[in-house]
A protein has these predicted regions:
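Arginine residue identity/basic-tract feature
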Residues: 17-18, 50-53, 82
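Edge beta-strands of extracellular beta-sandwich domains
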Residues: 85-92
Length: 92
C-alpha cells in the first residue's frame, strides 16, 4: 500500500523524534542539525531532495524541494517544502 504524503511525513518525523530523544548536545549548524548519539556526532541535513543523516547516508525523507533545521526558543524544528506545500514540525 502506498502511503500518502502526510503519512510519510509523520512517519519520518516520528523516526527523527525518536532518534533525537536519545541524543544530546543538539546544535544548529548552517541549516543542519548536529547531535551526539552513543558518543558519535551525527548530522541531519538536506541533500539532493532528501533529508539524510551522516555519517553514512540514511534517508529519512525524499522528494523534498527544500528543507532547513532551526531552533526556536527551547525547541528544534524542521521546515520543509514538498509538492508546493510547506511543513513545519517540532523534532525536539
Amino acid at each position: 500500500a502506498h502511503m500518502d504524503v502526510d503519512t510519510q511525513n509523520q512517519f519520518a518525523v516520528l523516526q527523527l523524534r525518536r532518534e533525537l530523544a536519545q541524543s544530546n548536545d543538539l546544535k544548529i549548524e548552517s541549516d543542519c542539525l548536529s547531535y551526539i548519539l552513543n558518543h558519535e556526532k551525527k548530522v541531519l541535513y538536506f541533500d539532493k531532495h532528501r533529508i539524510v543523516k551522516s555519517p553514512g547516508y540514511e534517508i529519512y525523507m525524499e522528494q523534498i524541494d527544500e528543507a532547513i533545521f532551526y531552533k526556536k526558543e527551547d525547541g528544534y524544528y524542521v521546515w520543509f517544502k514538498k509538492k508546493n506545500k510547506t511543513y513545519d514540525f517540532e523534532l525536539y
